């Protein structure tokens, strides 16, 4: 349920919707906050604080080499954190998972889309996977998933944190940067965003 608040067109749609929402309300639209809103306010499923916190703090856009859970005491503190994020979206960077499961969820979010976006870009004929530089985590989706998971297990098993080693973390950051330059900022993608996604969000 962590991405249940995502609008159409993933993060691109989210950015355009955020601009419109902020212009009209003074608050921000962020998919992780919307996921919490859906599961806690719109449909009150009586979900635990730890689960809602994991959903709010799952955003893989903010990668770390080590994830230490930080205890969250009550719903009042949690609601205050969420409201602060609506007012200033930079506060999302302060959200930290309160459990190891939440930490796993956050790093898994990055692992899930890093190679999959490359796979999708190749299917859409935007570019070939061999356009990427070889690195410690590989270049193909299956390689990236396997190499990162194995490294995280090796560095985290039996520990009170979730961690990958420095080599794999640097490779992850490089791969993510390559995705931005080669996929998300690609002229074809930008043109479709400008001509299709933005007008649809305005409707």
Predicted regions and their residues:
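Aspartate-rich (DDxxD/NDxxD/DxxxD) Mg2+/diphosphate-binding motifs
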Residues: 1-32
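Histidine-centered, transition-metal-coordinating active-site segments
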Residues: 12, 28-34, 38-203
């Amino acid at each position: 349920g962590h991405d249940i608040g995502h609008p159409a067109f993933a993060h691109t749609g989210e950015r355009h919707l955020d601009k419109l929402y902020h212009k009209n309300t003074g608050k921000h639209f962020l998919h992780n906050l919307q996921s919490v809103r859906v599961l806690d306010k719109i449909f009150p499923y009586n979900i635990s604080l730890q689960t809602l916190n994991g959903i709010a703090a799952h955003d893989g856009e903010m990668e770390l080499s080590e994830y230490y859970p930080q205890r969250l005491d009550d719903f009042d503190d949690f609601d205050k954190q969420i409201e602060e994020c609506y007012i200033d979206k930079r506060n999302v960077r302060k959200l930290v998972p309160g459990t190891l499961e939440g930490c796993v969820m956050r790093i898994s979010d990055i692992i899930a889309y890093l190679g999959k976006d490359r796979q999708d870009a190749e299917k859409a004929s935007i570019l070939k996977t061999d356009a990427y530089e070889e690195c410690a985590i590989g270049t193909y989706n299956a390689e990236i998933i396997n190499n990162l998971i194995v490294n995280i297990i090796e560095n985290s098993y039996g520990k009170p944190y979730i961690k990958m080693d420095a080599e794999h973390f640097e490779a992850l950051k490089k791969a993510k940067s390559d995705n931005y330059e080669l996929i998300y900022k690609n002229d074809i993608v930008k043109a479709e965003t400008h001509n299709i996604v933005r007008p649809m969000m305005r409707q």
